[in-house]
């Protein structure tokens, strides 16, 4: 159930609120996203009850934008996977400039795209559930503790309910961290072999 007094806003207003450091709920093609801009990142971790040292994905508006967040040049398999699955439910973990890793995704949901465009840059995103809890397909399913803590929600068609596939290409590896119906270990290995 959605929290009492949850404020529904347009994608354009959501972009403005995110630039101000607010945190919100946005539908994606997978599960409901808990999103924030850079100014709201610490609050996002607080709302989710997640250790700020844990990785979080960045949503981007285009494949080139997402791949540019990793060390240049991106691995050839990253380009191949991006071409096949983006926009869509795939998170790539890449080596980041200056060390560490970065998880990037280009969503396919029109509302998510509109919020990204309005925000004018990448958004930090995670599933809208308490750390360790189940992800929600629709806004109405979001844990009341989450919906009560966020600043806004943007309405839109619910996603599939299946979280995105996650492929780790950091350190020269090819590891499937989360399989989906559309990307299995066998399919990833076939794509990796070219």
Q: Where are the model-predicted features located?
A:
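Active-site-adjacent structural elements in enzyme catalytic cores
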Residues: 1-194
């Amino acid at each position: 159930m959605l929290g009492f007094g949850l404020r529904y806003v347009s994608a354009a207003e959501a972009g403005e609120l995110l630039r101000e450091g607010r945190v919100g709920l946005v539908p994606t093609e997978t599960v409901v996203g808990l999103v924030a801009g850079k100014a709201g990142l610490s609050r996002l971790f607080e709302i989710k009850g997640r250790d700020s040292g844990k990785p979080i994905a960045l949503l981007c508006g285009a494949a080139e934008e997402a791949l540019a967040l990793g060390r240049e040049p991106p691995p050839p398999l990253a380009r191949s996977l991006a071409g096949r699955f983006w926009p869509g439910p795939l998170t790539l973990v890449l080596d980041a400039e200056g060390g560490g890793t970065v998880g990037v995704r280009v969503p396919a949901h029109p509302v998510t795209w509109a919020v990204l465009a309005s925000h004018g840059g990448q958004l930090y995103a995670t599933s809208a559930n308490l750390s360790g809890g189940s992800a929600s397909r629709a806004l109405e399913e979001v844990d009341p503790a989450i919906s009560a803590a966020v600043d806004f929600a943007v309405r839109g068609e619910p996603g599939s309910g299946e979280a995105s596939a996650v492929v780790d290409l950091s350190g020269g590896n090819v590891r499937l961290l989360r399989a989906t119906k559309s990307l299995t270990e066998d399919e990833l290995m076939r794509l990796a072999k070219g």
